[in-house]
Structures are given as structure tokens and as C-alpha cells.
Amino acid sequence: MVRFKKRYFVVQFDRERDSYDPLSNKDSFKKRAFQDSWPLHIKDHDLALAVKDIVEHIHGDFGRAAITTGLRAIYSNPETHLAMIQCRHGPHRLVGSSLPFLKSIGNEKLVPKLIYTGATIKNCFKVKDIIIFNFL
């Protein structure tokens, strides 16, 4: 029996802002994502479908076929705007290189920030807890 290795991505989403100035105050921008009153209402299926579409747009049919069998969104929190994506080892490089180009999920215009890429879901949940603890 063969074990399939997996990789996990921890991603934080923020609404796309037209007036964002990266030099103004970076700490307030990080904290604002948690303090906004808008919850992130996206379904895991919509997130996985958006990732598949952007990988196909960037890497073509090969990229879509490589990630289709092992890609799924396993966690999304509407309050902290964090999500976790699971992918097979190997094609995870295609997913990681395509995530910065993701601009919308469903009707939501979002800006993704790749926080962490890990081999175990346990480490991803540790990172998630650290992020929530530091910014709340």
C-alpha cells in the first residue's frame, strides 16, 4: 500500500481595498483584518473551485489535471478569515505559485496572503492558533 503525502496551505483573506497604502501602517492593516465586522462567507467547495480555476489559468490543463484529485479546502473560519487547503505533494508547488493570483471567490473580491505551507495538519493548526492569539 502506498501512502500519499499531502501538503497544507494556511491562507488569510482580506477584502480588496482601493486605498491601501503598504507604507502607511502595517500593524493596523494586519489587525484590521480581524477587527472588521464583515464575516467571510465562502464555502469550502467554492474555495477549492476557485483555486482549481486559477491553477488552470496559470498552468493550463496540466496544472488542473495534476491538482484535481488531491485538492480540497479543509477549514475556513468566517471570523478570522483564515482557510486551509490540502493538496498532494508534488502538485502543491503549482498551487503555491498560483495562490497570489487569486482575486475573487464567488462574488467576493479578496486578497489572499499565504501564511504557511506545512506537511502536517497539526502544525498548520498550531500556526493558525498563533496567528489568532497574536492578532486578537
Task: Tell me the role of every PLM-derived stretch.
Residues P100-L110:
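A common structural junction motif
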Residues R17-I74, F125:
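Surface-exposed, low-hydrophobicity interaction/linker segments
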Residues Y8-D14:
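Active-site-flanking beta-strand signature of metal-NTP-handling nucleotidyl enzymes
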Residues L82, Q86-R93:
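Helix N-cap motif at beta-to-alpha junctions
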Residues P22, P91-P100:
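Charge-rich, low-aromatic oligomerization/scaffolding segments with amphipathic character
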Residues I121-L136:
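Short, low-order "capping/linker" segments at domain edges
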Residues V2-K5, A65-I67, Y75-E79, R88, ...:
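Intrinsically disordered, low-complexity regulatory regions enriched in Ser/Pro/Gly/Thr
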